[in-house]
Amino acid sequence: MFKGTTILSVRRGNHVVMGGDGQVSIGNTVAKSNARKVRLMSDGKVLAGFAGSTADAFTLFERFEGKLSKHGGNLTRAAVEMAKDWRTDRVLRRLEAMLAVADEHCSLLISGNGDVLEPEEGVIAIGSGGPYALSAARALLRHTSLNPRQIVESSLEVAAEICVFTNNNLTIEELGGE
């Protein structure tokens, strides 16, 4: 079973940044240190990141991109339709992963339970290092004037220092901003 990762998305207004570490672990062994778990979709208008089984994540990325195309890039509609399929489809139901998605207007967490959640304070964190990254990001968002990219970088570094399934080989993508 592949496990462990940290994906973090931080938003200030229309500036949204999503980052993830590069570690893929099989059991207690690092199988890969430079995986890309965050990517741009929908002609560079949507950010997406995954936590969970690598094979499952690629299936979900492909399905979600199809939903975005079908619904004209409407993130919320695509996310709701994806969650419906994920929950009801016999094959998809077995996939073990979570998706964080965002465009310039909205950030959402999509789970296999059919959940589509808009985060509090514009921060989404998933994966084994998620709680550490979430704590750091919320503190930096509340008490500093750092931009979302700086917050994502700093928070993922904190998660990598604490979570053994998270490394500091980061992939960071952003939309909007200066």
From Swiss-Prot:
Catalysed reaction equations from the record: ATP-dependent cleavage of peptide bonds with broad specificity
A Gene Ontology term for the protein's cellular component: HslUV protease complex
Record: residues binding Na(+): A160, C163, T166
Keyword Metal-binding: yes
GO MF term set: metal ion binding; threonine-type endopeptidase activity
Alphabetized InterPro entries for the sequence: ATP-dep_Prtase_HsIV_su, Ntn_hydrolases_N, Proteasome_sua/b, Proteasome_suB-type
Location of this chain's protein in the cell: Cytoplasm
Mechanisms controlling activity: Allosterically activated by HslU binding.
Pfam families, per the entry: Proteasome
Keywords (A to Z) from UniProt: Allosteric enzyme, Cytoplasm, Hydrolase, Metal-binding, Protease, Sodium, Threonine protease
Record bears the keyword Nucleus: no
Annotated active site: T5
GO biological process, one term: proteolysis involved in protein catabolic process
UniProt-listed Enzyme Commission number(s): 3.4.25.2
Classification via Gene3D superfamilies: Glutamine Phosphoribosylpyrophosphate, subunit 1, domain 1 (3.60.20.10)
SUPFAM superfamilies: N-terminal nucleophile aminohydrolases (Ntn hydrolases)
Superkingdom classification of source: Bacteria
Summary of subunit composition and partner proteins: A double ring-shaped homohexamer of HslV is capped on each side by a ring-shaped HslU homohexamer. The assembly of the HslU/HslV complex is dependent on binding of ATP.
Family annotation (NCBIfam families): ATP_dep_HslV, PRK05456.1
General function of this protein: Protease subunit of a proteasome-like degradation complex believed to be a general protein degrading machinery.
Record-stated family: Belongs to the peptidase T1B family. HslV subfamily.
Name the record gives this protein: ATP-dependent protease subunit HslV
Species per Swiss-Prot/TrEMBL record: Magnetococcus marinus (strain ATCC BAA-1437 / JCM 17883 / MC-1)
Organism classification: Bacteria, Pseudomonadati, Pseudomonadota, Alphaproteobacteria, Magnetococcales
